[in-house]
């Protein structure tokens, strides 16, 4: 629809946002494999290993850029910053793509790697990366089975994310690949955490390189905005 709207001569710009959450959603092997197969189809890349998946994601990243995209958006429970090796991530991909369930440690390592890769992609194109974090989802099993995901049974989560957030941002910054960033918390107890975190990674290259996002979801109301 973005392409059709642009080609129609519509004067208002309607630009897409890159939202690759499913590429790191490895909790359910069948769902992940289904996503990878769809990614292969739309990208035209045959995917049989981790490097293939990244190549396909880069191709889609390029496509979104061609459509005017300048923002990525990542919906995460918390920040992930586990230590990992390339060999570990490739092995984890092979395991989950083959249908085997991952351990909690493997899930966290994979998510940590993907966040860094996405951040590097955005830096290469000068995009801004956004993170909406802090929700716990699908809390009512009965209603989840009846209606599915995203049907009103999500709430504010309570996570200890300051260290992981700092480590993630520092990884990109240390490698000279920390792009413009906006952080949106869902739990108001993290307001001061983010407000102070911003100052750690401002580098003077542009005003407000790392920013506190506006009140989101449950905080998108008068009290939430004033506290922020």
Report residues per predicted region.
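Generic long, charged, amphipathic alpha-helical segments
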Residues: 208-217, 228
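Short amphipathic
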Residues: 18-20
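Short, conserved secondary-structure transition motifs
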Residues: 22-25, 217-221
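Short beta->alpha connector loops
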Residues: 187-189, 218
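Histidine/acidic residue-rich metal-binding segments in metalloenzymes
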Residues: 1-12, 34-180, 189-207, 224-227
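A conserved mid-domain beta-alpha-beta active-site/ligand-binding segment of alpha/beta enzyme cores
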Residues: 25-28, 35
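Short catalytic-loop micro-motif centered on adjacent basic/acidic residues
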Residues: 180-184, 212-213
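His/Asp/Glu-rich acidic catalytic environments and adjacent acidic regulatory segments
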Residues: 15
């Amino acid at each position: 629809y973005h392409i059709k709207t642009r080609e129609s001569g519509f004067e208002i710009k309607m630009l897409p946002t890159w939202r690759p959450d499913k590429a790191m959603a490895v909790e359910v092997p069948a769902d992940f494999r289904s996503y990878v197969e769809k990614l292969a189809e739309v990208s035209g890349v045959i995917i049989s290993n981790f490097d293939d998946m990244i190549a396909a994601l880069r191709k889609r990243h390029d496509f979104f850029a061609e459509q005017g995209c300048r923002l990525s958006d990542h919906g995460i429970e918390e920040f992930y910053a586990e230590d990992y090796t390339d060999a570990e991530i490739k092995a984890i991909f092979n395991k989950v793509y083959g249908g085997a369930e991952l351990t909690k440690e493997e899930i966290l390592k994979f998510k940590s790697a993907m966040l860094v890769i996405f951040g590097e992609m955005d830096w290469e194109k000068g995009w801004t990366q956004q993170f909406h974090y802090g929700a716990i989802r699908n809390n009512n099993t009965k209603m989840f089975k009846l209606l599915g995901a995203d049907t009103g049974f999500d709430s504010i989560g309570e996570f200890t994310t300051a260290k992981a957030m700092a480590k993630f941002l520092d990884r990109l910054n240390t490698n000279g690949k920390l792009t413009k960033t906006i952080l949106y918390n869902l739990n108001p107890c993290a307001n001061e955490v983010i407000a102070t975190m911003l100052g750690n990674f401002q580098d003077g290259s542009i005003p407000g390189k790392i920013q506190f996002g506006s009140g989101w979801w449950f905080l998108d109301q008068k009290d939430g905005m004033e506290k922020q």
